Amino acid sequence: MRTPKEKNSRSRSWEDDPRPRYWWHRLPGMNFVPPVYSELTDEEWAILREWYDETDRTGVGAIGECVVPMISFLHGFMMGNRARRIVQLGTCSGYSAILIGFMLRRMNAPRGLYSLDMSAEMCAISHRWIARAGLDDFVAIVELNSTDPNGLQLAREYLGGAPELIIVDSSHEYRATLTELDLWYPALIAGGLIVLHDVSRFAADFDVTKAGGVRRAFDEWRRAHPEVETFCLNGESQTMDLPRPLYKDACGLGLIHKPGIPAGSE
């Protein structure tokens, strides 16, 4: 077993790594291990570190994780409230699916994450790592377009009820994101939360269709649904340069809260 000093040095090896994906660890004052990493067992940390090593070698196609600010938000929200029925739209190569799987296992919440991605390659990578981490009882990786209506019933059947938390980090395209919100919001349990990555002006450029990205979809959807509680962090961010606002991710974070109290059966 590692000593406390070794445990507290885990992600600090990335503080001097110049590669873009490690930007958070190079920010001023971030010379510590965030709780989402420090709470992992030695075996879990080894899995995540090996995942990083492999995806570093694989290259750009496998790199697209949400990194520390967003996963830390999800970590606190999930663990503090025992969110146990989660849908993820966009799996990429499995970073958040692995970490959410570890959280679900810690909470003893099996069949807790239903993660969709339309890329067969990304699903294969993610599924291999989920199996390697021993998370097959907690996470399902499904090759399916997140705009496919069939996903609604499939997710509900796997989770055993309506999703409590939906994470949107998929195509980054305006039209697809708007379709996702229209499709999945009605499926969300009353009192549930949708979390969207990439709602900023900076991230709008990720839309390969050049139609305004997640930011435009989120803005239009929230204007069309004034009865719904919504919030946008860093929506005006236009650069990764310093100085950064309090929420450090220039890609921004959007929140959609479905008003109401869930029925007792949920």
Roles of regions detected by a PLM:
Residues M1-I167, S171-E266:
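A short alpha-helical cap/connector motif
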